[in-house]
Amino acid sequence: MQLYNTLTRKKEHFEPAVPGKVNMYVCGITAYDLCHIGHARSAVVFDVLVRYLRHTGLDVTFARNFTDVDDKIITRANQEGLTSQEVAEKYIATFYEDMDRLNVLRADLEPRATTHIEEMISLCVRLIEQDKAYATPSGDVYFRVRAFPGYGKLSGRDVDDLRSGARVAPGEEKEDPLDFALWKAAKPGEPFWESPWGNGRPGWHIECSAMSEKHLPLPLDIHGGGQDLVFPHHENEIAQTEAALGKDFVRYWVHNGFVQVNAEKMSKSLGNFRTIRDILENYLPETLRYFLLTKHYRSPIDFTFESMDEAEKNLKRIYEALGLLHAELEREKWTSGPLPKDVTEEFEGLRQAFADAMEDDMNTAAALGHVFTMVRLANRILDNKGQRKTEGARAFFRAVLDEAATWFAVLGVFGREPAGFLAELRACRVARKGIDPAKVEELLQARINARADKDFARADAIRDEIAALGIEVRDTPSGAVWDVL
């Protein structure tokens, strides 16, 4: 598999340090608020990476942390009249609920910052002993950025350029404006722990270094997160970890791109902030997951309701095709004969193309394109009355459904029972568009009655009235069926 390594700025052949085993760490949430679609994208991207690596036979140990002590958590605790621990527990619980709905697998290890204070203090002590960090009279501990010659290698930033814009805030006791906090002295009303420098709490960056060292062998095979974490968080992780250990921290750095909303940066000030729960009030979770896979993970993705509607339509088309294949396989009598050779060759080519897309830096957008081509191929056989009843077609239909199981295993979509999913999808669309199903059924019955009375003008008028509601009616051998346009 080829993976783009942020550190080297190129795609590289992925090969774990220990053959057959992968250790992977991804930065999790700071638990102070509901998760937004940026969190959803990062979670889905790395969920697919874990799924795919396991699909190829690799034994993956996946760790994703929770930051449960932080300035933002303390601020939220004061706003809500809760303790910091209560705030963290509240939003970790909502995180799990959101991820379960998006079919994101639980990580194997989910360390929390507050249960690793001892490890963080130990890392600070090692850095101070090596003169890579220093404690201030006030009880803060800072990392000496200039003591680490490789600072900036991940983000491509130059230390001297950073220095020109850096300032020391009033009250700080930094030796250099570039230095960053490893440990923060306690302030009134904030949670704290005892340390060699007095009561205090960890800085943000030290948390991931300490937790990854505690739970996984270093160097990590993969360390991931959103593009926004490249600097300063991941740059600082590298500096403090490699300075303390004297060896490489991570072999492959993987970062997902930003989520924009209507081509603008998502922010509360712009009024375009979208939580996962906001979106799932109007769309099924699988629609959001599917949408997040329609762009390459390193590219920005633009969230719009139009793009969600398009994702919904495409998801519907695939499930409809899978449903038809399941129904066709209920046939009891099949005629002998294979399918044309070009059909089987095209199918095998598409299977390989799907795998090749995933091997090429996890290109889910291209992989989904091959899924659609395979669905069109299946529909072509279903539409051919001569071919669809053959033994060759039966084997082909089964092979497509087997391949759909692979899509689900790797992408985490297309795994529902088609009829159930389509019914839930219709109910979701009906609710979103404010359609009254009882009214539709009433009109359909009136249309049936008009046709029975041979009042075809009335029947056509009712059909137009139904269409004006945003409803499509299809007449089938078993009766009229309707769906949302």
Swiss-Prot record:
In terms of Gene3D superfamilies, this protein maps to:
Cysteine-tRNA ligase, C-terminal anti-codon recognition domain (1.20.120.1910), HUPs (3.40.50.620)
Motif 'KMSKS' region, per the record, lies over 265-269
Gene Ontology CC terms: cytosol
Cofactor note, please? Binds 1 zinc ion per subunit.
Location of motif 'HIGH' region in this chain is 29-39
Q: Where does Zn(2+) bind?
A: 27, 208, 233, 237
Q: Tell me the GO BP annotations in alphabetical order.
A: cysteinyl-tRNA aminoacylation
Q: Which Pfam families match?
A: CysS_C (PF23493), DALR_2 (PF09190), tRNA-synt_1e (PF01406)
| Catalytic activity as recorded in UniProt | tRNA(Cys) + L-cysteine + ATP = L-cysteinyl-tRNA(Cys) + AMP + diphosphate
Q: Does the keyword Transport apply?
A: no
Cofactor annotation:
Zn(2+)
Binding locations of ATP: 268
Which of UniProt's keywords are assigned here?
Answer: Aminoacyl-tRNA synthetase, ATP-binding, Cytoplasm, Ligase, Metal-binding, Nucleotide-binding, Protein biosynthesis, Zinc
Note whether Aminoacyl-tRNA synthetase occurs among the keywords. Answer: yes
Q: Where found, per UniProt?
A: Cytoplasm
Molecular function GO terms recorded: ATP binding; cysteine-tRNA ligase activity; zinc ion binding
Please classify the protein's predominant subcellular localization into one broad category: cytoplasm
Q: State the family it belongs to.
A: Belongs to the class-I aminoacyl-tRNA synthetase family.
Quaternary structure and interacting proteins, as annotated: Monomer.
Name the UniProt record assigns to this protein: Cysteine--tRNA ligase
Gene, per the UniProt record: cysS
